[in-house]
């Protein structure tokens, strides 16, 4: 028997559903985090249009969360931190699709070394998205190196603003909590990585798609197709990263292909197989996986 390709199965699945099955648009809010780029690839290939799925772009993790709270999206992409915040308000929110695990993609940068920051009494200007996983990373940094939190001036900015910071005052102590691809511009401005989820921060950061149980039931077929085309997009990335980048580069401008490839090394795709060790860590973090597609 001939082997049926994944693409052919997806086409049969889509064609087997009447257009009326997808009359209502499924809106998903998403940032330009490298782990979510398969969604943009699927959009550019027209796969999302076929099942009436629309991406709503957000400039930050916190804005992404606010879009969902305001009813401007039916599902949102984010970390387990944003999930835990929203779950307090809406207990029926569930993770339904996994993208990646940060393995260096979330990081802390500075214009001073950790030793200099630790041994100083000067104030520290800390730039971050406060209502996001950024805050957890900064708190971990403060605790790990016994830094007096009274020295910290918390400055809430979205990542597009943060990435435009310039290292023009060498005496001023600046700490920046960011994530790929925004770290690239900061590196060019003279800031250096001092900690990351690969080096020094033992934090589990999972990127997933979340929605309410009722919404999942209502749009179940669309979510299932979304899962299939996202997996297909990740395979396309692994098979031909240049073609993938050229397809979605407008969303990442001004990131270069080389910088994009560097960023990919700082995440681990978990869309298909979950190692048992990771499942254990997720359970300890109270992250449910029973509804994951």
Please give the residue ranges for each predicted region.
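Pocket-lining segment of extracytoplasmic ligand-binding domains
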Residues: 81, 150, 154-245
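N-terminal hydrophobic or amphipathic helices and topogenic motifs
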Residues: 2-5, 14-54, 63, 259, ...
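Secondary-structure end/capping motifs
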Residues: 217-292
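Extracytoplasmic/secreted proteins, especially bacterial periplasmic and envelope-associated proteins
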Residues: 37, 43, 63, 67, ...
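Proline/Glycine/Serine-rich low-complexity intrinsically disordered segments
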Residues: 113-119, 136-137, 142-143, 149-152, ...
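Short, glycine-/small- and polar/acidic-enriched structural segments
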Residues: 22-147, 153, 174, 180, ...
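Sec/Tat-exported extracytoplasmic proteins
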Residues: 72, 77, 87, 142-145, ...
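Short glycine-centered helix-capping/turn motifs at secondary-structure transition points
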Residues: 46, 71, 168-171, 190, ...
């Amino acid at each position: 028997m001939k082997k049926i390709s994944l693409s052919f199965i997806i086409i049969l699945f889509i064609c087997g559903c009447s257009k009326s099955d997808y009359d209502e648009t499924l809106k998903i809010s998403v940032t330009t985090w490298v782990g979510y780029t398969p969604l943009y690839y699927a959009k550019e290939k027209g796969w999302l249009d076929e099942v009436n799925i629309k991406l709503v772009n957000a400039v930050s993790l916190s804005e992404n969360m606010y879009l969902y709270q305001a009813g401007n999206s039916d599902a949102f992409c984010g970390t387990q931190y944003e999930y835990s915040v929203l779950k307090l308000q809406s207990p029926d929110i569930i993770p339904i699709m996994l993208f990646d695990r940060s393995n260096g993609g979330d990081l802390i940068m500075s214009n001073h070394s950790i030793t200099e920051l630790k041994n100083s009494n000067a104030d520290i200007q800390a730039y971050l998205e406060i209502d996001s996983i950024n805050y957890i990373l900064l708190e971990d940094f403060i605790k790990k190196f016994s830094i007096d939190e009274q020295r910290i001036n918390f400055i809430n900015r979205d990542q597009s603003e943060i990435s435009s910071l310039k290292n023009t005052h060498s005496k001023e102590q600046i700490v920046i909590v960011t994530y790929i691809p925004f770290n690239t511009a900061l590196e060019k401005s003279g800031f250096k990585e001092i900690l990351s989820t690969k080096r020094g921060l033992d934090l589990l950061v999972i990127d997933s798609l979340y929605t309410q149980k009722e919404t999942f039931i209502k749009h179940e077929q669309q979510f299932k197709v979304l899962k299939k085309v996202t997996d297909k997009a990740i395979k396309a990335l692994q098979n031909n990263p240049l073609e993938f980048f050229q397809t979605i580069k407008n969303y990442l401008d001004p990131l270069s292909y080389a910088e994009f490839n560097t960023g990919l090394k700082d995440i681990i795709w978990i869309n298909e197989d979950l190692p048992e060790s990771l499942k254990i860590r997720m359970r300890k973090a109270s992250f449910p996986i029973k509804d994951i597609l």
